[in-house]
Every structure is written in C-alpha cells, then in structure tokens.
C-alpha cells in the first residue's frame, strides 16, 4: 500500500522501494508506512485462531562439538549447527540443488535458508550432519573474496552490457593461484549495467559494466566503485570511478592483493592507511 501511494511510476529505474526514502526522506517514509499500516489494521482482521498457529517443539539432537571450519556456525540451540554454502557467483546448478536435496532429505528437521547475497545456510544440523553437508559443499566459496556477488550478466539478461559471472569466475580463478590469506581481498559486487542488480554501489569494491573506447576499438569494461557500505547507520553509496577493461580486472585484483599481503594486512585496515596507493593502482590499469 505504501509503494502504491508513494512509489515512482514515472521512472522505471526508480520503481523500487529503496528509492522511497530518497523522495520522502527517512522520517517521511516512516510516517507514510505507519499511516498505511494504521489503515490496514483498521480495515483488515488480524485475529488468529489457535488452530492456525504453527505448533513447534524444541529440536533434540546429539551433544554438539566445536568445529574449526568457518562455514560451520553454532546455532543458539545447543547441539545444532548451520553450514554456510555460497556457490561461486550464486550459480546453484540443478544438479547441485538435487544433490543437496537428497543429502538432507533424510536428516530430521534440517532446512535450507537463502541469503540476500546469493548464498544459503543448511540449518538445524547435528554435528555429524554438519560434517556431511560441509564435505558436500567444498565447491563453494572458501573465503570472503569468493563470496563476491555478481548479477546474472549479459549472457542471459536482455538489458545488461557486461558479463558479470564470467568476470567474477575469471577473478576467482586468478586470485586462487596466489593463496592470499582470508580478508586480504574484500567481497566485491559486480553489476553488468547501471540497473545495479549486483548492488555495486554498496560494495567495498564494486564494478559496473559498460564499454570503453580504446585505440583498438570498443572493449568490454567495468567502472570501479569503492568504499560503499550497506550496514544500517553506516550506509555509503559510492561514486563511480574510472573504467578498467574487463580482461585486466583479474590482474588488477591480484596486484592489489600482493600489495596488501606485503604488509601482512587485511583490506579494511590497509585501505584506511593506503588509499593513495589504491588510487595509483587504478590509474595504472586505466591509463
């Protein structure tokens, strides 16, 4: 109801709830939502019958044990674990989905929960079940950089320009050979065009697809964004920087990783003290 009343129907690119705060302001959006909520509560019946409520009972499984692998997370319920799995680029193939289904189908109360960043959690696992799920998902992201996000890309999207999944795969393949420590390179966000499906503006490093004119003719390129943040209260929408040709971006990230590794640092600490070096590296790859 709030979007119907206040959403942008003139500009298709801004026909999203996230743009309502821009047009109404933070307080205005809260006020508009409360106004519509009040109307719905007066006009609709929200009374629930006890028979409609989901009856649940505590899940009982064997005593838990500690795990060293970061992808296994202890749940708040004693003895239960969640296993994080992110297919590279969020591309969960039908065969892999079937494999996961057949693996967890006999596991009592085990479920899959999806994340907004193309990953998933297999929850309510016992210790032994968590180990089985972990072994079955070794093809996914193994560190922060490999959890990077890419939109579906121009090979499928009719609007897109850049092939985001191909770029991400090339970057991960190149970076893996360097064996950087976890955290040396941040999670990146890649969109194939200005539609922002890869949410490049909120990425620590983001790339947005386009075309760059070169002496050899037009080539696929991605404009770089840096310093974005999606955390509540710390939100930053980054500005667009220069464009780097797509086939040079894996080398750019490898060189960046080597610079950071040389100082035995993680990206977030390094960039705060070495932003000028980061800009110099961008200039090198956009010259």
Please report, for each region that a protein language model flagged, where it lies by residue.
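Radical SAM enzyme core and accessory elements
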Residues: 268-287
